[in-house]
């Protein structure tokens, strides 16, 4: 990975050096982004401050050794062994990183002050005073704590929050933080510690005997111990002195005493036992008990420090196969001594144990051994004659360089002196090309003489071997030893006359070859350790319990799934969100839903900040009164009248606060009108705000818009005053463009330092001699502005809105009620018209000047309307009924008329939506017509930094009227308008082509002499406008300024060559610019831009095409009809092929394992075996527990093996199991519901969603209970049923709360594999007597008929009394080209989940359909608390509510309940198709519709366990709905057909033929094989193992269509 990053960076750098500037910029940006990402990643690492002074090389050592940390080197503290001391803190943090945060930790010999500073309240330090140095170190730690606290006191600070818990623990219970016992004897007892215990040992393990370490850890129940200590591999080579170069320290060994010290400085040394340290290094197992052991594992070595961990191991978890019987020798001898009089065999038996054995090996690497050899050195004492031999490591290259060279010496030259001379010369220097250079071998010079002796002896021996080899091992009369000593005597002469005798006595000659051998050392040394433990029992390996964390994770993932709908959700900080929920103890799902609701503006709350930074969120959440630092005051505080003068006096300017809604339709205005003169000489600071708007807006959207409008005035006023103050503070630094907008008057000299372009300013900002700034109302005399003595300068602005904003704020503040704006109940109608559609003309034609009011944005528009309205000579339009918006707001309450009937706002969409809401409320009108253009320039927020959320820009209206005929625009512009507007735009203009363009070479070309411009001159920007005015052009305006105006000819000019964002293909400014003229428009531009492309395209249009947009008069009405789709299925007859094995194969692939279940005797097994049932209160007649014997008729045996069950026999146990499954243990999922009111709301949605508008009210003229309805009901009954009514007098009703209970003999097959693990309970029938059905049956039959007649059958299907062909017709107009979401709601335990709320919904539906109140109350009581009696099985019980499976309303009741349930949660007005049948439902919605959390809503309101599935094809009532490009076809489920072919209840061949005919009726569509491929896809959606099934569909058709062939699917059971 590192190589890849390096290669990528190098490639990018090479790219940057190229000549392509674009590629260079991209590469530089990539490098920048990579660097930012890398620094951000480093920023997330734990931070460690390294204060000690170290060198640059040491800085690099620390950084590379600990990449897990972000280390900051301050170099502010000189200290002894500064690197090692600084690394101590890094080593501690590295050890603590290995431990889960918050787990109880023992720091053996640790620094408790370090843990306090880190805020670790879960660490206990064992710090025994083993010597005086330990006492000194402990006192130093306490001193550091006192120093830290004194610094906090001196700075007036308190202990930070993250440290507080740890310091409190040390202050109240110091023994919990630190004790002065050894770890082996520590008495600390943790309080309420449920997690695992850990330990760390930082350079303290030396002082704990290795044999006691395991037991000490077990006594504290330590799970894992992490340790760090200094060591060097060279100590294993028995070196007496070892350097630790990186930290500049050393080890020296003297026997078992090992001393650690720092070189090049005077500091205390540390002494330890070498044998004890060696045990920690070389051992692997540290026994803790006869069962548990701690196993050591090395982790890493960093800067001469070894890190390891000791893990607690339970030997009983070992696989029992590793245990074997063996004899424990110690136990054997003990037994023999204690019981010698017993037999030896008995002693052997007593000593026999089952032992567990394990072994380990550790390799130690010696990097310094590489390219080294071991050389023996010899010495002998002349005084004591004692010889000695030692070994040293010498460079392999050096050794063999010397040996190879001296091997070339002649026999006479091969002397010790010559060898020593050569060795010393190459050690001191080496000659390269005649130049002497420093030797490359750094051999200790003190060893050169001894090395030379070894080299000399080694060479002599080698010469001898060569001679022996040459002579073919024939040595004559001399032995090898004699040859050796002859050579030695010849070389040394008489130097050592007695050496030979001594060596002979010591028998050295025999080992001469071995003694002189040069060995190559191993790079690794292996240490072995063995564990032997007694096997007593075997324990299963426990699993880690992470259920709680996974549950929390599941909740968090669900919350994040909820948040995924937000924009830029991929950048959502999950860690911050999780920490927030944890710290505030908030449910993540609740928090997520609140966030989504707020961000999607569905909560009645608006957050105005764009980015949820810490500052913004803090401002949103903090107390508003505390947040008002001189400027912010929430108007919702309890004051009777908000006073602007009081606010100014306090130095405050109020913002709109929190929401409340007052629906009254009139104002009670304050009679005391504040005057603007009261704010003369108010301080500028009281108007300048740091915060642009309220952070939070609450209340209905209109209220939020109105509050935002108030804040926009405050922000505009603040910006204007702030700019004038800035001008006064720095007059000399004003640029040329700013000088054209502002003016500064020097009061002393009465001269304009900056002369303004306009005159007679009403307001300005005054700077006094005390350098104070005030807002002043300016007055004039013949000398100009009237000034005061303490004034120094006066600043004015030609764009200043101080006067108007203050006046509007004064008005709006007086209209607030307890700080809340009032929303009018008037009807608001938006008239959306294309440019030039005659909006002003329409206003004049509709207005009644005696009772209506017209408001327009500008003065020119107001004067134009007055002029046109009074053109006949009669004055009807005055300044009272035709006004500008600013005038109406500023002077509100000063005129005689305060209430108007209708309000007309021209160009209302150019206003702030909150302003429009205020205007409607202030006019007290009944209807407000807002004329505007949704595609032209909207309201533009011109205050930088002021938030105007996107949803605030949408005006809330009650109706929208469109005008799509333009009276102004020529045909070519009309063609462009059709691209921008919905609906067909036409024009009454006779001009066809009107637009043109001209590219000019530069801005200097545009001047009145060389380039006179025809007609009205327009620009896009103010800078272009000022440039044209300065060159002598007159009457120049921007496009924004002339919106709503009409000119015959227009010259549109662009002088700015840089990109302008408002010139784009879909820009509203372009639309306004193209639609101002009636005859011609010419565009002059210095650059090619999108508008040039648009004009060129319009120039190319043919006249024939433009004629299509021309009409003689405006269109009064347009009839719009939606497209209708109706198709027919393609029919391709299915070939009749296949065999029984095809059906069996397909069934086994879809439902693997079902066909292998031998379930013929399941019912018998259940009766004969013990069974435990959980039942509610019921009465059982045990005399019915044994069913009466019946003659068994052997049914036909199916050849297709399915999960079909044998018919069951009614009995106490069978019926009780069915009752438990179908009626007992009803789920209780719903929350607290206002049943009556909620049911009424649900039924409202039901009627609005499904019923035709004209049939939503019942026909009271039709009687539900009549002879005709009774006859219709009787026609559907069997004769047996009618016979039961022969003795019924219809005078009184039987008990309506009494039901009978029975079961169906045949279990229902499920199309899943549950049969393999469950005993399928039978379906129950709970039914009334026929006497009750005779009363209510006709009633509900008539109610059902009325309901079905009222349903919008084009979109909804209530599947009652429908044939499969009718289902196909209903879905036949589905258009497969329209993207759709196919929804299925799957509800389990549907009948028994229905409670009082479901009954209330159903009764309310019947009541609104005309159900008579008395009978309705009787029916309601009969379904509240009901008694069930099963006379056959002897069972009696009581149930509340629930759906009765044999009731007269079972099917239609279930159908309306599922429909009402879905209508209460989904927006049915958007639905394409919907079908309901019992508990089945199928919905088709347009693609992309948003759906609520169905499961949550169904649980809480409807008490249903439900899941909502999105599919490609629908599945409804056992049929697949296959929509295609020609319509729709309905296929019966082929798997369900095959399941039925395995039926085991067919009595005889006649019964079989009836069975075949019924299957043929439902499966007739399988004869059409045109859509088998789509059917395969639909089946695969439900059964993922299903193969393509065309072969089995054809097989089904083959057998179903031939009654003779169909008989082959069964065999006669009586013959078997």
Swiss-Prot record:
Helicase as annotated region, ranges: 830-1085
Reactions the enzyme catalyzes: RNA(n) + a ribonucleoside 5'-triphosphate = RNA(n+1) + diphosphate; ATP + H2O = ADP + phosphate + H(+)
Keywords: ATP-binding, Helicase, Host-virus interaction, Hydrolase, Inhibition of host innate immune response by virus, Nucleotide-binding, Nucleotidyltransferase, RNA suppression of termination, RNA-directed RNA polymerase, Suppressor of RNA silencing, Transferase, Viral immunoevasion, Viral RNA replication
GO molecular function: ATP binding; ATP hydrolysis activity; mRNA methyltransferase activity; RNA binding; RNA helicase activity; RNA-directed RNA polymerase activity
Listed Gene3D superfamilies: 3.30.450.420, P-loop containing nucleotide triphosphate hydrolases (3.40.50.300)
Family: Belongs to the ssRNA positive-strand viruses RNA-directed RNA polymerase family.
Positions of the (+)RNA virus helicase ATP-binding domain: 801-963
PROSITE patterns registered for this protein in UniProt: ALPHAVIRUS_MT, PSRV_HELICASE, RDRP_SSRNA_POS
Domain Alphavirus-like MT: 72-281
E.C. designation(s): 2.1.1.-, 2.7.7.-, 2.7.7.48, 3.6.4.13
Subunit structure: Heterodimer of a large and a small subunit.
Domain of life per record: Viruses
Binding annotation for ATP: 833-840
Keyword ATP-binding found: yes
RdRp catalytic domain: residues covered: 1380-1493
Organism: Tobacco mosaic virus (strain Rakkyo) (TMV-R)
Note: This protein is translated as a fusion protein by episodic readthrough of a termination codon. When readthrough of the amber terminator codon TAG occurs between the codons for Gln-1116 and Gln-1118, this results in the addition of the RdRp region to the replicase.
Domain called (+)RNA virus helicase C-terminal: residue spans: 964-1116
Pfam families: RdRP_2 (PF00978), ToMV_Hel_N (PF20896), Viral_helicase1 (PF01443), Vmethyltransf (PF01660)
Entry keyword ATP-binding: yes
Region called Methyltransferase, residue ranges: 50-458
Identification of the protein by name: Replicase large subunit
GO biological process: DNA-templated transcription; mRNA modification; RNA processing; symbiont-mediated suppression of host innate immune response; viral RNA genome replication
Alphabetized SUPFAM superfamilies for the sequence: DNA/RNA polymerases, P-loop containing nucleoside triphosphate hydrolases
């Amino acid at each position: 990975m590192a190589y890849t990053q390096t290669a990528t960076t190098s490639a990018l750098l090479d790219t940057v050096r190229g000549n392509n500037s674009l590629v260079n910029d991209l590469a530089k940006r990539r490098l920048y982004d990579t660097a930012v990402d890398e620094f951000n990643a480093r920023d997330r690492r734990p931070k460690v401050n390294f204060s000690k002074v170290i060198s640059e090389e040491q800085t690099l050592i620390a950084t590379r050794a600990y990449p897990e940390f972000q280390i900051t080197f301050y170099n502010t503290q000189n200290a002894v062994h500064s690197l090692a001391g600084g690394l101590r803190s890094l080593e501690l943090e590295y050890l603590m990183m290995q431990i889960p945060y918050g787990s109880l930790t023992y720091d053996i010999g640790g620094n408790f002050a370090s843990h306090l500073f880190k805020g670790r309240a879960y660490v206990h330090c064992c710090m025994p005073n083993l010597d005086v140095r330990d006492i000194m170190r402990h006192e130093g730690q306490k001193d550091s704590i006192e120093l830290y606290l004194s610094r906090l006191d001196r700075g007036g600070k308190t202990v930070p929050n993250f440290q507080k818990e740890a310091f409190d623990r040390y202050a109240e219970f110091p023994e919990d933080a630190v004790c002065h016992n050894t770890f082996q004897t520590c008495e600390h007892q943790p309080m309420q510690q449920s997690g695992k215990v850990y330990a760390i040992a930082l350079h303290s393990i030396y002082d704990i005997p290795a044999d006691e370490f395991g037991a000490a850890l077990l006594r504290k129940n330590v799970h894992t111990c992490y340790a760090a200590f200094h060591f060097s591999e060279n100590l294993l080579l028995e070196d007496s002195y070892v350097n630790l170069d990186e930290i500049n320290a050393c080890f020296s060994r003297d026997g078992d005493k090992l001393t650690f010290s720092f070189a090049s400085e005077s500091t205390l040394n540390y002494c330890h036992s070498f044998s004890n340290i060696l045990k920690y290094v070389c051992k692997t197992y540290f026994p803790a008990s006869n069962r548990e052991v701690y196993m050591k594992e090395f982790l890493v070595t960093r800067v001469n420090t070894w890190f390891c961990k000791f893990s607690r191991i339970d030997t009983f978890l070992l696989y029992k196969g590793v245990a074997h019987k063996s004899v424990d020798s110690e136990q054997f001898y003990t037994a023999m001594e204690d019981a010698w009089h017993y037999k030896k065999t008995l002693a052997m038996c007593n000593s026999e144990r089952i032992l567990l054995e394990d072994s380990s090996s550790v390799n130690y690497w010696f990097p310094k051994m590489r390219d080294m050899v071991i050389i023996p050195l010899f010495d002998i004492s002349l005084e004591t004659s004692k010889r000695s031999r030692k070994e040293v490591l010498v460079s392999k290259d050096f050794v063999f360089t010397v040996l190879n060279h001296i091997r070339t010496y002649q026999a006479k030259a091969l002397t010790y002196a010559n060898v020593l001379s050569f060795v010393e010369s190459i050690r001191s220097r080496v000659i390269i090309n005649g130049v002497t250079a420093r030797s490359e071998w750094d051999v200790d010079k003190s060893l050169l003489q001894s090395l030379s002796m070894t080299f000399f002896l080694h060479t002599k021996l080698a010469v001898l071997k060569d001679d022996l080899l040459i002579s073919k091992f024939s040595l004559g009369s001399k032995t090898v030893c004699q040859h050796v000593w002859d050579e030695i005597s010849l070389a040394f002469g008489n130097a050592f006359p007695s050496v030979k005798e001594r060596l002979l006595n010591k028998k050295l000659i025999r080992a001469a070859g071995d003694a002189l051998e040069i060995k190559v050392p191993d790079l690794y040394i292996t240490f072995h350790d063995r564990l032997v433990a007694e096997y007593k029992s075997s324990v299963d390996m426990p699993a880690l319990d992470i259920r709680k964390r996974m549950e929390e994770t599941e909740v968090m993932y669900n919350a994040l799934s909820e948040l995924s709908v937000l924009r830029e959700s991929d950048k959502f900080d999950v860690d911050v969100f999780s920490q927030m929920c944890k710290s505030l103890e908030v449910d993540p799902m609740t928090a997520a839903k609140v966030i989504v609701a707020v961000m999607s503006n569905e909560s009645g709350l608006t957050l105005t900040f764009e980015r949820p930074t810490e500052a913004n969120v803090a401002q949103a959440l903090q107390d508003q009164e505390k947040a008002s630092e001189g400027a912010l005051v929430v108007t919702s505080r309890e004051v009777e009248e908000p006073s602007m003068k009081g606010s100014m006096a306090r130095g405050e300017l109020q913002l709109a606060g929190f929401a409340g809604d007052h629906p009254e339709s009139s104002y009670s205005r304050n009679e005391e009108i504040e005057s603007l003169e009261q704010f003369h000489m108010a301080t500028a600071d009281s108007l300048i705000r740091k915060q642009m708007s309220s952070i939070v807006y609450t209340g209905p959207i209109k209220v939020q818009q109105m509050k935002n409008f108030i804040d926009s005035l405050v922000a505009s006023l603040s910006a204007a005053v702030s700019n004038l103050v800035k001008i006064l503070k720095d007059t000399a630094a004003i640029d040329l463009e700013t000088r054209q907008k502002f003016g500064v008057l020097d009061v002393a000299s009465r001269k304009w330092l900056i002369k303004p372009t306009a005159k007679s300013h009403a307001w300005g900002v005054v700077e006094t001699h005390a350098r104070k700034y005030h807002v002043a109302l300016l007055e004039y005399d013949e000398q100009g502005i009237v000034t005061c003595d303490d004034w120094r300068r006066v600043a004015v602005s030609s764009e200043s809105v101080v006067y108007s904003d203050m006046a509007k704020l004064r008005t709006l503040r007086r209209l607030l009620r307890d700080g809340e704006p009032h929303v009018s109940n008037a009807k608001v109608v938006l008239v959306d018209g294309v440019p030039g559609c005659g909006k002003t003309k329409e206003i004049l034609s509709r207005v009644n000047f005696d009772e209506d009011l017209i408001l327009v944005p500008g003065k020119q528009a107001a004067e134009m309307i007055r002029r046109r309205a009074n053109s006949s000579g009669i004055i009807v339009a005055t300044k009272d009924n035709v006004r500008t918006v600013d005038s109406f707001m500023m002077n509100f309450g000063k005129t005689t008329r305060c209430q108007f009937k209708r309000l007309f706002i021209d160009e209302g969409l150019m206003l702030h939506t909150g302003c429009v809401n205020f205007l409607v409320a202030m006019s007290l009108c009944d209807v407000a017509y807002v004329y505007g253009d949704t595609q032209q320039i909207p309201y533009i927020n011109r205050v930088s930094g002021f938030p105007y959320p996107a949803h605030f820009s949408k005006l809330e209206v009650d109706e929208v009227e469109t005008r799509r005929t333009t009276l102004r625009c020529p045909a070519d512009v009309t063609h462009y308008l059709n691209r921008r507007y919905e609906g067909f735009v036409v024009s009454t203009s006779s001009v066809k082509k009107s637009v043109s363009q001209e590219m000019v070479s530069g801005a200097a070309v545009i001047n009145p002499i060389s380039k006179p411009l025809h007609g009205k001159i327009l620009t896009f920007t103010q800078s272009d406008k000022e440039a044209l005015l300065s060159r002598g052009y007159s009457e120049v305006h921007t496009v924004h300024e002339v919106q709503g105006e009409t000119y015959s000819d227009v010259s549109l000019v662009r002088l700015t060559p840089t990109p302008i964002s408002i010139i784009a293909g879909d820009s509203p400014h372009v639309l306004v610019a193209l639609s101002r003229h009636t005859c011609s428009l010419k565009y002059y531009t210095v650059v090619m831009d999108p508008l040039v492309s648009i004009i060129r395209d319009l120039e190319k249009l043919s006249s024939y095409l433009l004629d299509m947009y021309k009409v003689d008069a405006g269109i009064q009405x347009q009839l719009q009809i939606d497209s209708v789709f109706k198709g027919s299925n393609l029919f391709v007859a299915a070939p009749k092929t296949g065999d029984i094995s095809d059906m069996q194969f397909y069934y086994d692939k879809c439902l693997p394992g079902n066909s292998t279940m031998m379930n013929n005797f399941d019912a018998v097994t259940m009766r004969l075996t013990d069974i435990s049932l959980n039942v509610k209160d019921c009465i059982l007649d045990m005399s019915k527990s044994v069913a009466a014997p019946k003659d068994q008729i052997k049914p036909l045996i199916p050849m297709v093996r399915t999960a079909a069950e044998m018919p069951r026999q009614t009995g106490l146990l069978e019926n009780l199991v069915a009752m438990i499954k179908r009626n007992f243990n009803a789920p209780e999922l719903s929350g607290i519901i206002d049943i009556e009111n909620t049911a009424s709301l649900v039924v409202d949605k039901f009627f609005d969603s499904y019923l035709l508008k004209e049939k939503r009210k019942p026909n009271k003229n039709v009687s539900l209970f009549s002879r005709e309805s009774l006859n219709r009901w009787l026609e559907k009954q069997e004769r047996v049923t009618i016979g039961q009514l022969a003795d019924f007098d219809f005078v009184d009703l039987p008990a309506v709360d009494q039901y009978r209970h029975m079961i169906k003999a045949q279990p229902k097959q499920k199309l899943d594999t549950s049969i393999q693990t469950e005993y399928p309970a039978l379906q129950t029938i709970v039914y009334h007597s026929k006497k009750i059905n005779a009363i209510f049956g006709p009633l509900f039959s008539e109610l059902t008929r009325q309901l079905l007649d009222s349903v919008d059958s084009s979109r909804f299907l209530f599947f009652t009394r429908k044939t499969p062909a009718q289902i196909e017709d209903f879905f036949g107009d589905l258009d497969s080209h329209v993207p759709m979401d196919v929804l299925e709601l799957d509800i389990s335990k549907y009948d028994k989940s229905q409670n009082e709320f479901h009954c209330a919904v159903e009764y309310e539906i019947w009541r609104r359909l005309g159900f008579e109140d008395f009978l309705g109350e009787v029916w309601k009581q009969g379904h509240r608390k009901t008694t069930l009696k099963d006379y056959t099985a002897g069972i009696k019980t009581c149930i509340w509510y629930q759906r009765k499976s044999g009731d007269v309303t079972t099917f239609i009741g279930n159908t309306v309940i599922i429909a009402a349930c879905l209508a209460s949660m989904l927006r049915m007005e958007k639905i394409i198709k919907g079908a309901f049948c019992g508990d089945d439902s199928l919905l088709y919605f347009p693609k992309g519709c948003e759906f609520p959390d169905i499961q949550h809503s169904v649980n809480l309101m409807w008490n249903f366990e439900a899941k909502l599935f999105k599919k490609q094809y629908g599945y409804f009532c056992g049929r697949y709905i296959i929509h295609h490009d020609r319509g729709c076809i309905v296929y019966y489920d082929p798997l369900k057909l095959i399941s039925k072919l395995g039926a085991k209840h067919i009595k005889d061949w006649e019964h079989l033929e009836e069975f075949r005919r019924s299957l043929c009726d439902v499966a007739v569509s399988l004869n059409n094989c045109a859509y088998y491929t789509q059917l395969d896809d639909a089946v695969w959606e439900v059964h993922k193992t299903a193969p393509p099934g065309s072969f089995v569909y054809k097989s089904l058709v083959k057998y179903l269509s031939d009654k003779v062939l169909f008989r082959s699917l069964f065999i006669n059971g009586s013959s078997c």
